[in-house]
Amino acid sequence: MTNAALTDAAIAAAAAEAAPMPILVAPHAVLRRKTREVKPEDMAEIRRILPSMFSAMYEAPGIGLAAPQVGLSLRFALVDLGEKDAREPIIMINPEVVAESETLAAREEGCLSLPNQYAEVTRPEQVRVQWRNVDGDLMEREVDGLLATCMQHEIDHLEGVLFVDHLSTLRRNMILRRLAKEQKMKRS
């Protein structure tokens, strides 16, 4: 395991002791804003809240969570495809897709900010992603499959894009109306 993976794992392990942050639900305005780049002076605050973000993601349960989903308009996100007893956390600061395959793959997606809503989304099958880790080191990884989908989904959040934006207008509107109805029933 690399030093970066050990650091990410240690931060994720602290989630067991952290109170989960509330996850915003669409149509919250923060979810539609493009985030600002994380600067070195932001890192102390980010390190402080990361365990609570992991806690929220694991409790939901989810495999990815972006800062806007917890009300922060900053460019960072978490992913973890591992099982509870074998976590594989990745903390991505200022991530970007730097290359993508021409081959596309369709995969069913959901989102913690659109609870109980799912749809098949077509994205590049393989991507190369660059990001900074919490120590400021530049990371780069070529990924495919579910991890590629998850990373692209979380990076979309940092651009103010939801998975439903990749669907037809009709399908997107059906999902958003259904979500609004479910949220209204939940409040009453």
Question: Predicted segment positions?
Answer:
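Positively charged
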Residues: M1-S188
